[in-house]
């Protein structure tokens, strides 16, 4: 498997260039190949734990299992940590982090009628977000203050496929109309 920390450091050393939105978005979408490599490396311990979490009907027990999994497995996963670092480097290197992300995330909450934290899965499972929505959601996950085992939003969003869903949405919306929309709304 690639050393994602090393790749992240190499990206950080790339000289700054004026790139088009399309070029920058395509650099971000390339991250999906690293995700696939990571997903293909899941061992039986990951898969069986995920299966147990998914089958659990008791909501409280489900949260406990998820917390334990994050604490005992994911927090010690060097490759997941590297993917997290790599994604953050890509977002900043290619200037894809949205400054006004909270404004757009709040619009997403209204669009999907999301109030409770547990309902966020409605948005996070969407694969049809426009570019601004998808980039705002990625920035929101990246900048979240919850770095304890209970939350670890970006790492867990990478692990559980949420980031891949968002990147798939970005890949599907790289077109002239959406890029023009970004040019208007993103400074």
Each predicted region: which residue ranges?
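Short, charge/polar-rich alpha-helical segments
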Residues: 120-129
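Extended hydrophobic, helix-prone interaction segments
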Residues: 21-24, 29, 35, 39, ...
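Acidic, low-complexity, intrinsically disordered interaction modules
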Residues: 41-71, 75-82, 98, 129-163, ...
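Intrinsically disordered, low-complexity linker/tail regions enriched in Pro/Ser/Thr
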Residues: 97, 101-104, 108
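Short terminal alpha-helical segments
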Residues: 3-33, 83-91, 96
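Long amphipathic alpha-helical segments
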Residues: 176-180
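Boundary/linker elements of alpha-helical solenoid repeat scaffolds
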Residues: 117-121, 149-151
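Amphipathic alpha-helical elements of HEAT/ARM-like alpha-solenoid repeat scaffolds that form extended
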Residues: 27, 65-68, 84-91, 121, ...
């Amino acid at each position: 498997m690639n050393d994602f920390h090393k790749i992240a450091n190499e990206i950080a050393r790339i000289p700054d260039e004026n790139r088009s939105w399309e070029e920058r978005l395509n650099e971000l979408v390339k991250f999906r190949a690293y995700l696939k490599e990571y997903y293909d490396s899941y061992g039986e311990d990951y898969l069986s734990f995920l299966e147990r979490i998914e089958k659990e009907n008791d909501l409280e027990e489900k949260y406990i299992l998820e917390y334990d999994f994050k604490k005992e497995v994911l927090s010690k996963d060097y490759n997941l940590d590297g993917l997290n670092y790599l994604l953050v480097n890509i977002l900043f290197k290619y200037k894809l982090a949205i400054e006004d992300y909270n404004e757009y995330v709040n619009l997403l909450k209204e669009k999907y009628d999301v109030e409770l934290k547990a309902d966020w899965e409605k948005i996070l499972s969407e694969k049809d977000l426009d570019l601004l929505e998808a980039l705002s959601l990625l920035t929101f996950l990246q900048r979240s203050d919850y770095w304890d085992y209970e939350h670890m939003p970006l790492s867990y969003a990478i692990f559980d496929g949420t980031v891949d869903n968002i990147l798939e949405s970005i890949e599907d919306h790289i077109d002239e109309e959406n890029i023009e929309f970004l040019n208007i709304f993103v400074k």
